[in-house]
């Protein structure tokens, strides 16, 4: 935020004050209580291609009578002189864009003293991107789940949700045309009012698969021997070309219903293979988040869903970070790579973690120290008729924890962002 400051007077007008000393003063053993320094934040986050931060530092100093001038040394930037304000304080507002990540000091000295009257530390950090997502497992999530999401936006003003919406909303015969349009209008409102994203989620329901002109697979379920609805079928059961067909059909359905063209994706049950991700790249998608921190869905241990994810996403864990998958192996970034960013679902879904676990995942990726490079925490939940108040409260509780570290409040490096927007921070 830019504050109105009086510009520095010329040396002549100031009665020939000496130039600022380049050499930093000695830090004081304790800050001098005769000076009151305000407005310096605890955290300043770097800008990048995904987002722009206010990289200005504002300093006000109330000084003892007869103080002639105040100089400041910010990190390793050149010394600068503060301007005297009409109320007698001294102030400066200056860019710290050239200060790299780390913990730094602001040193302030008066009247050319070689000992500073104040040393104030601050943190300069790359952003900690927190991504909140929803997976539409069902054609109609119900009104209560949507109301809960509206409440989350009300409680957390900076929240951005990536809604992985469902193409089967528009092919399930149980959903009336009027209800389809009601759900589409709700998604559009979230995007337009809150800056949310409308991405794509696919469980290969037969009503959707057959509407795309394909034969529905029913014998590769993560839960059942046969699933003639298609819901629990591994998405990887559809090869690269068939997956491309499903994606193009989904895009057509979204565009026809006013949702725009989705650019990001998560597979139902996280069951994406290399062919799945390659098909996404073929279809122009820019990011996928099917790579699962599988150890956190231990509720499914002993079942095919757990086994499949453990085998296919073996190295993905609490602290896995974005990468461009190899054309030969979806788990590595060996060249040549696909033109799609994989952002691991390292925070899993709220269905499978307690609030304490969710907060510990936040801490695993941010230990309170400045980040040298951007990091991501991906989490989400399933909006559905079954979505409970306790699940809502876990999401809300986690967001309260994340809000304590917001970059905009100078309290930490947290920036809420959608999946499509975070891609720019991880350009290949």
Feature-to-residue mapping (PLM):
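Acidic (Asp/Glu)-rich catalytic clusters
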Residues: 147-158, 176-201, 206-208, 212-223, ...
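Surface-exposed, short loops/turns at beta-strand junctions within beta-sandwich domains
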Residues: 96-103
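C-terminal domain-boundary segment and adjacent tail
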Residues: 287, 356-428
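Short, compositionally biased P/S/T/A/G/V-rich stretches that sit at domain boundaries
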Residues: 20-57
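Active-site beta->alpha N-cap acidic-glycine motif
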Residues: 117-197, 261-263
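CE4/NodB-like, metal-dependent polysaccharide N-deacetylase domain
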Residues: 153-154, 158-161, 228-273, 372-380
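Active-site-adjacent pocket scaffolds in enzyme catalytic domains
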Residues: 267-375
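Aromatic sugar-binding surface patches on proteins
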Residues: 85-93
């Amino acid at each position: 935020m830019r504050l109105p400051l009086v510009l520095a007077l010329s040396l002549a007008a100031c009665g020939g004050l000496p130039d600022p000393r380049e050499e930093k003063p000695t830090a004081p053993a304790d800050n001098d209580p005769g000076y009151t320094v305000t407005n310096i934040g605890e955290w300043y986050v770097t800008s990048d291609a995904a987002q722009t931060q206010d990289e200005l530092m504002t300093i006000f100093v109330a000084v003892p009578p007869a103080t002639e001038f105040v100089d400041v040394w910010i990190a390793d930037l050149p010394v600068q002189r503060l301007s005297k304000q009409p109320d007698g304080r001294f102030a400066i507002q200056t860019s710290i864009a050239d200060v790299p990540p780390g913990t730094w000091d602001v040193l302030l000295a008066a009247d050319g003293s070689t000992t500073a009257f104040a040393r104030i530390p601050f943190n300069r950090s790359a952003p900690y991107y927190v991504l909140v997502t929803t997976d539409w497992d069902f054609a109609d999530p119900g009104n209560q789940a949507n109301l809960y999401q509206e409440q989350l936006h009300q409680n957390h003003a900076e929240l951005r949700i990536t809604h992985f919406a469902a193409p089967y909303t528009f092919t399930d015969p149980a959903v009336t045309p009027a209800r389809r349009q009601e759900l589409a209008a709700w998604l559009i409102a979230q995007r337009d009012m809150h800056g949310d994203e409308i991405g794509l989620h696919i469980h290969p329901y037969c009503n959707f698969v057959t509407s795309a002109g394909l034969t529905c697979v029913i014998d590769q379920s993560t839960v059942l021997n046969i699933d003639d609805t298609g819901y629990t079928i591994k998405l990887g059961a559809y090869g690269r070309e068939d997956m491309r067909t499903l994606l193009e059909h989904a895009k057509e359905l979204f565009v026809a219903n006013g949702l725009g063209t989705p650019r990001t994706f998560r597979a139902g049950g996280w069951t994406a293979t290399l062919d799945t991700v390659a098909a996404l790249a073929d279809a122009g998608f820019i990011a996928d988040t099917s790579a699962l921190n599988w150890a956190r869905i231990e509720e499914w241990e002993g079942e095919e869903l757990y086994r499949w994810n453990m085998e296919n996403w073996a190295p993905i864990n609490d602290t896995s970070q974005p990468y461009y998958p190899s054309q030969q192996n979806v788990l590595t970034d060996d060249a040549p790579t696909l033109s799609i960013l994989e952002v691991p679902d390292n925070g899993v879904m709220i269905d499978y973690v307690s609030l304490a676990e969710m907060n510990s995942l936040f801490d695993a990726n941010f230990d309170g120290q400045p980040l040298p490079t951007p990091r991501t925490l991906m989490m989400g939940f399933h909006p559905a008729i079954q979505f409970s108040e306790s699940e809502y409260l876990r999401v809300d509780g986690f967001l309260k924890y994340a809000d304590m570290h917001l970059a905009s409040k100078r309290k930490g490096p947290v920036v809420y962002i959608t999946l499509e927007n975070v891609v720019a921070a991880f350009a290949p």
